[in-house]
């Protein structure tokens, strides 16, 4: 009789242990999923904020270009870092849109521009290791640059 109770108690311990392992595993997967989704959301929000800042600078450059004459304009924009692989990011400026190309993932982003400047827009810059970039309007063209323009120094 004593052996049966001892065996039942041992089986209870084993099942309780296995239930604990199962619950801890489920919690770990759940916590990992929350962390991954949070990181992805933060990346998307940082990229969107960066794109909005650059688009606003392009609009200000367009406004300056409409003053006519030989207007030069330059504005520095700080690039917010993300946890994405930015070595695969390219930023393209077109007349009516700013495009972020993510060659290695799902973070491609487009921001519309008014395109009301007196000149054209063009430029493609890599974002690998970039901490800041410049929106420049010079000689009738608005473009992106990683280097500080000479006229601004």
Regions found by a protein language model. Give the residues of each.
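Glycine-centered recognition micro-motifs in short, flexible terminal segments and loops
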Residues: 1-18
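Short, flexible segments with low predicted structural confidence
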Residues: 2, 25-26, 33
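Alpha-helical hydrophobic helix detector
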Residues: 17-29
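N-terminal export/assembly leader peptides and their processing motifs that target proteins to secretory
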Residues: 29-153
């Amino acid at each position: 009789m004593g052996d049966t109770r001892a065996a039942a108690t041992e089986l209870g311990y084993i099942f309780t242990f296995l239930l604990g392992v199962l619950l801890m595993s489920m919690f770990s997967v759940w916590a990992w999923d929350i962390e991954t989704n949070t990181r992805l959301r933060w990346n998307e929000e940082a990229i969107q904020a960066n794109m909005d800042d650059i688009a606003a600078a392009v609009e200000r450059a367009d406004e300056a270009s409409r003053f006519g004459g030989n207007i030069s304009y330059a504005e520095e924009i700080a690039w917010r870092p993300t946890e994405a692989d930015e070595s695969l990011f390219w930023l393209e400026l077109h007349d009516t849109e700013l495009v972020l190309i993510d060659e290695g993932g799902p973070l491609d982003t487009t921001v519309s521009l008014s395109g009301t400047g007196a000149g054209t827009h063009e430029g493609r810059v890599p974002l690998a290791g970039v901490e800041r970039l410049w929106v420049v309007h010079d000689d009738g063209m608005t473009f992106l640059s990683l280097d500080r323009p000479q006229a601004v120094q």
